[in-house]
Design a protein with these regions (language model features):
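Hydrophobic alpha-helical packing residues
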Residues: 18, 104, 166, 211, ...
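Extended ligand-binding groove/face enriched in aromatic
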Residues: 52-53, 64-185, 190-192, 298, ...
């Protein structure tokens, strides 16, 4: 396999298109948070600050509005505010970051060290108290990053315990795939009956190597995180489509979904680079990324990532039908973020393979 620079460049054009046509006053929400974090990581990989003005404008806007941080999804923007604080030293970026940290440190725990995913938000007061696998990306990645860079050993340990605790609640030990949530009152993962959401398993595969980067391989929790990552990767290899994509439901007939595909590609390439996976995963990882790029649409109207399922929750009633009924869209923020993460890892692989 050969590295094709045009694949990386196409994703960069997508990032440029989004930042040049979108209002930086994006939502204070998880999808926008991941997009902003991915843009800053893309800048870091390229040795640039191309997207800093866009992301700093986002922070400036929310510094005036003073957003609520009341759930994992509204803690995720700490990824942007912390990145911009490191870039600029701006006091308001630090204040917003500290607000997220206060939530992480002081929000009551729901089960073990884990928080109610929907927190004290309006949705959290209606939906059953539960831990969601989404939190591994929306909550644990930032926590591990901030803690490691600021020598906060207590917070590092807290973040490092999260993957094992999520596994105790949501990992199907027979299939080695992850349920979307764990309902605490029932004491069970939900949904059941081998309903495994593709993007949720993508969060795991993309986030675990990020967390390992942050806590370090000498941390006592690292070996178990790697083992969980490997077993789920093996399971995912067994449900991959012939075109190297993944469906929105991994073991049931459903449509192919490219945010999950991009997340898994990114996580596999990251894991191969760090030695967690062997070379057997390389071709599937590369082909998955290339398939996502091939599915992009580019014309005078713009450039778009396609086949991204809309925001998804584990519906209390008829959850399998609920996943299947979520419509596909283009350029959803979290889907673009996933593709950028994969493009970054693809570029790293290309650089390493050329040396």
């Amino acid at each position: 396999m050969n590295y094709k620079r045009e694949n990386f460049d196409k994703v960069v054009r997508l990032a440029d298109y989004i930042t040049s046509t979108s209002d930086p006053k994006m939502k204070w929400m998880w999808g926008e948070a991941l997009l902003g974090y991915a843009l800053d990581e893309l800048d870091r990989e390229c040795g640039e600050e191309k997207y800093t003005p866009f992301l700093k404008s986002y922070c400036d806007y929310w510094a005036k509005v003073d957003p609520a941080v009341d759930q994992s999804d509204t803690a995720a923007p700490g990824l942007i505010t912390y990145a911009m604080y490191k870039r600029t030293g701006d006091a308001e970026c630090k204040r917003l970051t500290d607000k997220v940290l206060d939530y992480i440190r002081y929000e009551p725990r729901l089960y073990l060290d884990c928080l109610n995913h929907l927190g004290s938000s309006k949705k959290g007061k209606i939906y059953p108290k539960s831990v969601w696998i989404d939190s591994v990306m929306m909550f644990s990645v930032f926590t591990s990053l901030y803690a490691s860079e600021n020598a906060d050993t207590e917070l590092v340990d807290f973040a490092a315990r999260q993957p094992k605790q999520y596994a105790s609640m949501m990992l199907n030990e027979k299939e080695h795939l992850w349920a979307h949530s764990y309902w605490v009152k029932r004491g069970k993962a939900f949904p059941r009956r081998n309903i495994f959401w593709g993007r949720g398993n993508g969060w795991v595969i993309a986030a675990f190597p990020m967390i390992l980067d942050n806590i370090g391989l000498d941390h006592k929790e690292a070996p178990e995180i790697i083992e969980l990552y490997r077993k789920t990767s093996e399971a995912l290899l067994g449900v991959m489509n012939d075109d190297y994509t993944f469906n929105t439901l991994l073991k049931h007939r459903s449509y192919r979904e490219l945010s999950a595909t991009a997340l898994i590609s990114a996580g596999w390439l990251h894991g191969i680079r760090c030695g967690y996976l062997n070379e057997r995963f390389l071709e599937p990882a590369i082909k998955a990324f290339e398939t996502c790029v091939e599915a992009m649409e580019e014309s005078d109207d713009g450039i778009f990532m396609t086949e991204i399922s809309g925001p998804t929750i584990p519906l209390p009633l008829l959850p399998k039908l609920g996943y299947k009924m979520i419509p596909l869209g283009k350029n959803w923020s979290y889907g673009v973020a996933a593709l950028i993460f994969a493009a970054i890892e693809y570029k790293k692989w290309g650089s390493a393979s050329s040396n």
